[in-house]
C-alpha cells in the first residue's frame, strides 16, 4: 500500500485542546461531541482528561485526541505539557458571562505562547440556549474573531447545537493545512505525512488562506 499509515485505525492523529475559564462548558462540549452526552450536574474538571473520536474527512480517517482541563488559575502549572503537540484549540466562553469573554484574549495569548502561533483556533460562544441571559452579542464575538484570525461558532452543549460543526470545522481546517503541505512537499499522497503517535505536526503555513474569519452561529 502506498503511503504511510500510523496504524490500521486512522490516517491522522490530531491533538486539540479545550481552553477557557472554568464553568463555560468545556467538559460538556467534549462529552457531547465524543459521547453525545450532557451532564447538568457536571463539576469542574480536576486535573486533565482527554477523549478521542474519529471522523472521516476527504475519505481519510481523522482521529481527534481532545484534551480538557480545568480553567482555574491553580491548574495553570500544567500548561506546557497540556499544550505540547496541539495543532488546534477550541477557546470557549460563556455567552451569559461577559467576564469569560473578556478573558479570551488572555487565553489566546497563553495558547500562542505555548504553541505554533498559526495554530487553528475555533472561538466558541457556549450556552446559546440561554437566549434571555445573553451578555455577549454575536456581533461582538465575530469582531474579535475577525481581528484575531479565528473561526467562530455559537454552541449549546445542552441542545447539541453546532457542537459537531465546531469540532468538525476545526479538524477540517487542520487537515487541509497538513494535506496541502504534503502535496507541496511532493509526497505521493497525503497519508505519507501522517505522524507516528506522539509526533508533533507543524502546521505553520504563512502562505495559506485558512487564517481568515470563518463564521457560523446558531
Swiss-Prot record:
Molecular function GO labels: GTP binding; GTPase activity
The protein's name: Ras-related protein YPT3
Family: Belongs to the small GTPase superfamily. Rab family.
Motif range (Effector region): 42-50
Positions bound to GTP: 20-27, 68-72, 126-129
Region (Disordered): 186-205
Lipidation (S-geranylgeranyl cysteine): 215-216
Biological processes annotated in GO: protein transport
Role noted for this protein: Protein transport. Probably involved in vesicular traffic.
Compartmental location: Cell membrane
Name of encoding gene: YPT3
Gene Ontology CC terms, in alphabetical order: plasma membrane
Coarse class of the protein's main subcellular location: membrane
